[in-house]
Every structure is written in C-alpha cells, then in structure tokens.
Amino acid sequence: MSFFENTRKPVGLGGKIMVAMMNLGHSPVARWGLRFLELTLDAKVLDCGCGGGANMKRLLKKCPRGIVKGIDYSTVSVEKARSLNQTAIQEGRCVVWQGSVERIIFAKDWFDAVTAFETVYFWPDLPRCFREVYR
C-alpha cells in the first residue's frame, strides 16, 4: 500500500505512523474549528472519521459531563482512538466504534453535534453519508 493510500484507511505499521501524523498534523485546523463549536457541558457529540481520537479528546474537554462517540472504519485508527481516550471510555463518557459513516448505528436525533475533521473527502457517497449524519 502506498503512503497516500494509507491516509484513506490506515493499516499495519505504516497506518500506525499515519494515524500519529494525522493526530499531530490535523491539530491546528481542528483547534481552530473547535473554537467556533458551542457545546453545553453535558453535550452528546459524534465524531465521524475519528481517526486516532485526538479530536475526541478535545471534544471531551469541551463537554466535561457529556458523551463523545467516534466512528472510523480503520482498525488501526479505532485502536489508537480507544487507547488515547481510555480514561473517558472507562468512565462511560466515550465510545469508539468501528464502522462506516454510511451506516451509523446510533439512534436518530441522539447527538447535539456531529463533527468530521479532515475526513469527508474519503467518504464514498457524500450525499448518502450526509443524509445519514443529518438524521
């Protein structure tokens, strides 16, 4: 798998390196965007394409009594996101699910906010995925 192919769905050792690079490299734009996201202290947030979980960690800080759930289809990304957010997972404030944004398993109208950082260009069918997120 080429370096750039590993950005779409990180796998193996190269994927682990890629996820670490994404957590770091996407940080400036994510921090900028999160400044504009107003959340209540007990907000319920979904992060689509959560990658290595760095933005989930930031979201958990913005809503310290809330719940943040993440979805990603890369096993490597899910493992990293779970590791990075282990404390919040143990507290019942965080869930990381492996799956596709095309088919979100969570209940309709459950979330107060949905985020997707540096990921929509990987979504297979944008209109379908956005309809799924909107529900």
Where are these regions (language model features)?
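Conserved alpha-helix/loop element of class I SAM-dependent methyltransferases that forms part
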Residues: 24-43, 58
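Short alpha-helical
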Residues: 28, 54, 75-76, 121-124
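Class I SAM-dependent methyltransferase SAM/SAH-binding core
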Residues: 46-103
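A short glycine-rich, Lys/Arg-flanked "PGG" loop and its adjoining helix->strand segment in the class I
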Residues: 127-135
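A short acidic, Gly/Pro-enriched loop at the edge of an enzyme's catalytic core
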Residues: 102-113
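A short SAM/SAH-binding and catalytic strip from SAM-dependent methyltransferases
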Residues: 113-126
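N-terminal, positively charged/glycine-rich alpha-helical extensions of SAM-dependent methyltransferases
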Residues: 1-15
